[in-house]
Each structure stands twice: as C-alpha cells, then as structure tokens.
UniProtKB/Swiss-Prot annotation:
The UniProt record lists the keyword Membrane: no
Entry's Gene Ontology molecular function annotations: 4 iron, 4 sulfur cluster binding; dinitrosyl-iron complex binding; DNA binding; metal ion binding; protein-disulfide reductase [NAD(P)H] activity
Entry function: Acts as a transcriptional regulator. Probably redox-responsive. The apo- but not holo-form probably binds DNA. Plays a role in lipooligosaccharide (LOS) biosynthesis by regulating LOS gene expression.
GO BP annotation list: cell redox homeostasis; negative regulation of DNA-templated transcription
GO cellular component: a single term: cytoplasm
Protein name: Transcriptional regulator WhiB4
Localization in the cell: Cytoplasm
Pfam families from the UniProt entry: Whib (PF02467)
Keywords on record: 4Fe-4S, Cytoplasm, Disulfide bond, DNA-binding, Iron, Iron-sulfur, Metal-binding, Transcription, Transcription regulation
Post-translational modification: The Fe-S cluster can be nitrosylated by nitric oxide (NO).
Gene encoding the protein: whiB4
Residues annotated for [4Fe-4S] cluster binding in this entry: C37, C59, C62, C68
Length: 116
C-alpha cells in the first residue's frame, strides 16, 4: 500500500488532504483484511512489465478485487498490481474516464448494468 513521506520530515498540505476519515479508514481496513494478497510478499505484486499479468492471477478469485481496484484508481496509485489491474490498465482507465469521481460507484453501476 502507499504512504506519503514528507521530504523535510514535516507534515505538508498534500499529506493532510490524503488523511482518511475514521469511517473511510474502517472501511478500507475491512476490505484489506479480506484480500487474498494480504499474506503475499509485496515484491511479488510490485513487478514491472509483463510480470504484472502473472502477478495479477492472485486477484482473479479475490473477494475484494473491485474495492482494491477502485481504491487504487481513486488514489491514482501508479505502481504495482491492484484489483487485478496492471499499471498500464489503470492508466488507460483513468485516461478513458477522466470524469469519474468515485471508481467504486463507477464499478457498482457497471456491475448492475451487466446483471440487469
């Protein structure tokens, strides 16, 4: 998962803006604790190039794949495999849908359309 490290050791505006509310933090802890990759060596998920597709295999049956992908897209996480998506796949989605404010909402709407 990502973290913010101020260069000079002091908190900055960016880090303050990225703090989660208590409810958001609890929600995130809830889904992260269910992730299949939680016990995986992070080095296996933060690989480059074609190795990312191989790394994404663990995501296929993950019960929180949608939440993970939405979190990575909402936070514009640049590196690693998240929600079964490679870096390139996430960049493409962000470029194709710059209007999306909440990727969780976007995925839910898309899921409802495909079911109904």
């Amino acid at each position: 998962m990502s973290g913010i490290r101020p260069v000079d050791g002091r908190a900055n505006l960016t880090s303050a803006q990225n703090l989660l509310s208590t409810g958001e933090a609890e929600e995130r802890i809830n889904w992260v604790s269910k992730a299949l990759c939680r016990a995986t060596d992070p080095d296996e998920l933060f690989v480059r190039g074609a190795a990312q597709r191989k790394a994404a295999v663990i995501c296929r049956h993950c019960p929180v794949m949608q939440e993970c992908g939405a979190d990575a897209l909402d936070n514009k996480v640049e590196f690693g495999v998240w929600g079964g998506m490679t870096e390139r796949q996430r960049r493409a989605l962000l470029k194709q849908h710059p209007e999306v404010v909440s990727w969780s909402d976007y995925f839910e709407k898309r899921k409802r359309r495909s079911v109904g």
